């Protein structure tokens, strides 16, 4: 199964989410590959992880810019799960990744929505459905330690409503990229971590994987759940 993680900004939340999902998935005994559109970034992280003896070990690959569908097809038999940090830019590689993904996870900051970038991302997600009608899109709200406030809630809900058949995660991530947990580590496996942040990542993981087969709920139901969570 291929899961892509994209967003509209070059913010670290996308990479943080991808790495934590990969670690938690590998910990469950699955063969996991973590891919990125940025050459070397996750390879360096994986090398640091290996050097520090951190387990589970994560295989990392670069998506590349050519023959992406062929590359992904070759990797499918080798891994149970492929997680792809697909970046924030509208590239051919990103489009190919979205066309091959079963689920797209979109971390979004309600208080930092750039209108131009927002519509570019929404167009990319809606366009991916033309080639991949069964694609599912899961937005994840990201806020500061005390958020989300009323304006952030409204912005996130409006953002989600503009993507066809998109859903909103019940989990809210509070400043997930605020701390450095050491070379090759993330909050899900750091020796000394923030238990609240780790619990949020675990909750997001549970939403992404445990409920994936039944994620096709109506937008109305999901928006209602989001409102209930944030009251």
Language-model segments: what does each one mean?
Residues 2-12, 19-95, 99, 131, ...:
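P-loop/Walker-type NTP enzyme "switch/lid" segment
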Residues 8, 37, 109, 142-144:
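Cofactor-binding loop segments of dinucleotide-utilizing enzymes, especially the Rossmann-like FAD-
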Residues 33-34, 84, 106, 139-141:
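Structural beta-sheet core signal
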Residues 87, 101-120:
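Conserved Switch II/interswitch segment of TRAFAC-class P-loop GTPases
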Residues 118-133:
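Conserved C-terminal guanine-recognition region of P-loop GTPase G domains, centered on the G4
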Residues 143-150, 154-189:
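Beta-strand-loop-alpha "switch" segments that mediate conformational coupling across diverse proteins
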Residues 186-231:
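NTP-binding/hydrolysis catalytic cores, primarily Walker-type P-loop NTPases
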């Amino acid at each position: 199964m291929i899961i892509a993680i994209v967003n509209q900004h070059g913010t670290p939340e996308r990479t943080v989410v991808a790495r934590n999902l990969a670690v938690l998935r590998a910990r469950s005994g699955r063969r996991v590959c973590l891919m990125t559109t940025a050459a070397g970034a996750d390879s360096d992280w994986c090398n640091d992880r290996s050097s520090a003896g951190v387990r589970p070990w994560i295989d990392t690959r670069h998506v590349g810019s050519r023959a992406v569908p062929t590359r992904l097809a070759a990797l499918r038999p080798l891994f149970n799960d492929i997680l792809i940090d697909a970046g924030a830019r509208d590239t051919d590689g990103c489009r190919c990744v979205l066309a091959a993904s079963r689920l797209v996870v979109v971390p979004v900051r309600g208080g930092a929505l750039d209108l131009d970038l927002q519509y570019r991302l929404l167009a990319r997600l809606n366009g991916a459905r033309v080639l991949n009608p069964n694609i599912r899109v899961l937005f994840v709200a990201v806020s500061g330690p005390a958020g989300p406030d009323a304006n952030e809630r409204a912005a996130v809900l409006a953002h989600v409503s503009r993507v066809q058949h998109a859903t909103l995660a019940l989990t809210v991530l509070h400043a997930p990229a605020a701390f450095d947990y050491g070379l090759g580590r993330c909050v899900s496996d750091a020796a000394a971590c923030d238990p609240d942040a780790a619990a949020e990542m675990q909750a997001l993981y549970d939403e992404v994987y445990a409920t994936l087969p039944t994620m096709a709920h109506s937008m109305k139901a999901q928006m209602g759940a989001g409102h209930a969570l944030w009251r």
